[in-house]
A protein has these predicted regions:
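Non-catalytic cap/lid and distal C-terminal segments of serine-dependent acyl enzymes
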Residues: 1-147
Length: 147
């Protein structure tokens, strides 16, 4: 839907720079962001250059695969990942929630994908429900540079 319907529609209605699109997701949407990133060569047609992945729910049970499976499958196909990825959590989120995210970030970093710019940030003073606002502001400034 996003690739085949939403982005083409938005491109018709608005002035869209198709070379610098950003996919954003928070919580389960953040988990989906990892899915989209590691399937970008097959499903997403490399549509998105930037990804904001906020407080991804790594404990999500999909019934099939988890984020590690998607990443492993991608790595078996490719060694480059031409994307900018900004992952955030709030400092007030539980360690049990954040630890799987940090472990997954470490796995990605150890792959040394060429073309990947990966930034992980813990935003002080925010929890799972409040970290989205400062995170999306940071994302827009990073990828579009305007206030």
């Amino acid at each position: 839907f996003i690739v085949d319907n939403l982005v083409p529609y938005l491109s018709e209605v608005y002035s869209v720079d198709s070379s610098n699109l950003t996919l954003t997701g928070h919580s389960l949407g953040g988990y989906f962001g990892f899915f989209a990133l590691f399937n970008s060569d097959t499903i997403g047609k490399n549509l998105f250059r930037n990804y904001y992945i906020g407080s991804p729910s790594m404990q999500a049970y999909t019934g099939l695969y988890d984020a590690y499976d998607y990443e492993e499958a991608y790595f078996s196909r490719k060694s480059n990942l031409d994307s900018n990825v900004y992952v955030t959590v709030g400092s007030e989120e539980s360690q049990g929630f954040c630890m799987p995210i940090e472990m997954f970030i470490k796995t990605i970093q150890e792959r040394s994908y060429s073309g990947l710019s990966l930034e992980y940030e813990v935003i002080e003073g925010y929890d799972h429900n409040t970290v989205f606002k400062p995170s999306i502001k940071n994302t827009l400034l990073k990828y579009y540079g305007k206030q």
